[in-house]
């Protein structure tokens, strides 16, 4: 059986984080795509997690790299490659999780993340080719304390 994340389109790190920043606006995907096509950044920049991100530059990177950004917004995606800093930005854009407040970093490992099962699935879809999400502790609710670490790296 094929892992679901293997079927998703692959994006470069700058484009994937751009998509996550755009999605952090809370606007629906079709509206985001329309704003991007029109290069109308004001509605996005007033609502995104990182309003300092150069949207036009990221669109140019997506175009230059032939990254299928529209399909990624509509259907989901996975990163071609993502380093620990990118994982931390993903967690911030997607779930407003921050180091020292919501988790701790120890080398190439993030621990103490309180994640619901749908969050685990979404994160795994995007980074699962390179990173693994493992249980630190199980709680009685749908929330688990998790850690994200590089695959094949001993703890």
List the model feature ranges, each with a label.
Residues 1-155:
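Structural boundary micro-motifs
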């Amino acid at each position: 059986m094929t892992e679901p994340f293997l079927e998703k389109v692959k994006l470069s790190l700058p484009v994937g984080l751009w998509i996550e920043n755009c999605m952090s606006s809370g606007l629906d995907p079709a509206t985001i795509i329309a704003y991007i096509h029109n290069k109308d950044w004001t509605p996005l920049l007033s609502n995104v997690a990182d309003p300092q991100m150069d949207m036009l530059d990221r669109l140019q990177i997506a175009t230059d790299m032939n990254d299928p950004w529209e399909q990624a917004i509509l259907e989901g995606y996975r990163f071609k490659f993502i380093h620990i800093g990118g994982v931390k930005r993903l967690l911030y854009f997607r779930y407003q999780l921050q180091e020292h407040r919501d988790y701790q970093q120890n080398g190439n490992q993030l621990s103490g993340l309180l994640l619901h099962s749908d969050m685990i699935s979404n994160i795994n879809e995007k980074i699962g080719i390179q990173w693994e999400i493992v249980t630190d502790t199980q709680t009685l609710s749908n929330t688990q304390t998790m850690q994200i670490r590089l695959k094949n790296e001993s703890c």
